[in-house]
Each structure stands twice: as C-alpha cells, then as structure tokens.
Amino acid sequence: MRFLHILILLIFNYNSFSQEFSFFNADFSATSLSLGGNVITKSDDISLTYKTTSLLNQSQINHIAFDYLSLSNEINLFSFVYANELKKFGMYNIGVKNLNYGNFQGYDANGFQTNEFHANDLMFFTGISKMIIKDLTLGLNLELLNSNYESFSALAIASNTSLTYNDKKRKLIFSISLNNVGKQIDGFTDIKEKIPTSLKFGMSKSLNHLPFTYYISLHDLQRFDISGPVQASQSYRDDETILKKMFYHVNIGGELNPFKKNLFLRFGFNFQKRYQMMLRNIPQLAGFSSGVGIKFSSFSLDYAIISNHISSVSNVFSLKMNLSSFVPNGKKD
C-alpha cells in the first residue's frame, strides 16, 4: 500500500523527464488542494507564496503557516512558512518543506535482508515580492532541495518568478508563475538530471451578488503532452485524444462563503488525476477534492480531503496565524 502512495506521488509531481527532483512540484496547501490543486491566485493564503511569491501582500505581515499532509501512516508531508515586510524592498517569506517516506527494509542482490534505511526530501526557500505598478506585483524566490534515500543523496537549487495582477475593485486576480528554473548540484548518480521546470497560469473571480469565488488553474504549460510516464494499458494510450491532453493542464475549484461569515466551503476537480487514476466501469471519486476553512480573529484552520485513487485518500491540514495578534500592543493587520 505504501508503494502505491509513493507511485501516485511520483506521477502527479511529474512534469519533466526527471523524477529525481519531483518534490519541487509538491503542493502542500489545504486550501489549494481542496480547490483542485496548483492554485496561484488566492491572495489570503500565505502557504501559496512559497511558489507564487507575488501573492505576498501587507495583509500577511508577521503571519506564519503550517501545513501537514498525510498520504499513509508512514508517508507524511510538512511545511512551514513565515512572511513579513522589508519596508524599502517589499514583502519577504522564508520556510521549509519536508516529505518523509518512512523507513524501509533493505535487501542485497541475493534477496537477503540488510539494514533498514530512511528516505526523505527536504527543501529550504526564501523569496521577496514588490508591487511594481498599481495592482501588479512581482515575486522572486530561491529554493534549495536535498534528497536522501538510503546511502544516496542529491542536491539542487532552483528559482521561481511570478507576476500577480490583483484588481480589488473587480475582485479579479490573474497570476503567471515560472517555477523551478535551476540546476542539479549533486545527484544520485553521475548523470545530470533536469529540474522539472513548470509554467503556470491562473485566475480567480469573486462574484458580486453571491459569496462565491471560482478558480481556474492551468499547469505545466511549457509542454503540451503531460499524459505521464505511466500507462495502465495500450487501450488507455489510444484513448488520449488531443482534447483530453488539453484538459490535463486544467484544475478548477470553487469557494463558498455562506452568509459572508468566517466559514468557507471548497470543492475542486483535477482533470489529469481523474483521467489517469480512475478505473473503468467502477464508480469512484478520483480527481475530486473538497474542504472547509474556519477563520478566527488571529488564526485560521483549513482542511482538505483529496481522492487520489479508489484505494487512496489524502488528508491535509493547514494552520495560519497572525503573530502580531498574540503580542500586546503589536502591529495588527
């Protein structure tokens, strides 16, 4: 079962010819995942700023966020991000992300047991954003990724560049993000692997007469065919029409804020996950996601449940806090 979870993780973090640094594309935010994933246009979620740094804004001054994703009893993802302001330079963030695969039993070439070993990915990141003209913000960040599997390790560095247009009067946001432009410093082998570069575009719009916001996210636009390295059978490959390959790039989601209070109900749909992970003639929810968020005066809680496959469901939790609210006479948003 743990192998299945790892396989699913590799497939949906895959967008280059390399899987060695697929962790660069891991999405940890409960808000984003409940809206279908790859969301880059939600300006009130600090967790999204690790890739789309242009989403940083003054409402996030002295804010902190923790994200936790459980794929199984042993495979867990954790992230932390902090944001604040540099008055002359704009906003900045700093954080860490970790994917723990757990412990594995080692075997030699003859099938005899050796020592247990551990596998994990660890990423450090920092970024800065600044409004360059009215409503348009530029964001830049750097990431350092270290992977350790048994006695093998790999190291890579990459950068992300993003632009966000936020028209508050029209309640409309557009973002474009070029992710993972970098190089391998050290690899598991002598072969130099490619960093999985990704181009994303997103938009969101809040309706004027209904407390509802819809999200459209387009991912991996640098390459048309992202049908993936794994095909269940030749019949599945034959079914890969041009239209279906186009929809592989699309995630959609919606957020309802009932009575305009502090409760948020979310749902999303991931076309690629639906097409590639569903089993024919068997009812299932692969590709669908949902979640709920509750906002308090000084912190908010978010939860998402994602159906990856008929036998795999992920639970994601996010906690975001305004640290200034816990300091007497501190600066509040």
Regions found by a protein language model. Give the residues of each.
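Positively charged n-region of N-terminal signal peptides that target proteins for export
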Residues: 1-4, 134
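Sec/Tat signal peptide C-region and signal peptidase I cleavage site
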Residues: 14-18
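Subset of outer-membrane beta-barrel
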Residues: 19-333
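Sec-dependent N-terminal signal peptides
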Residues: 3-13
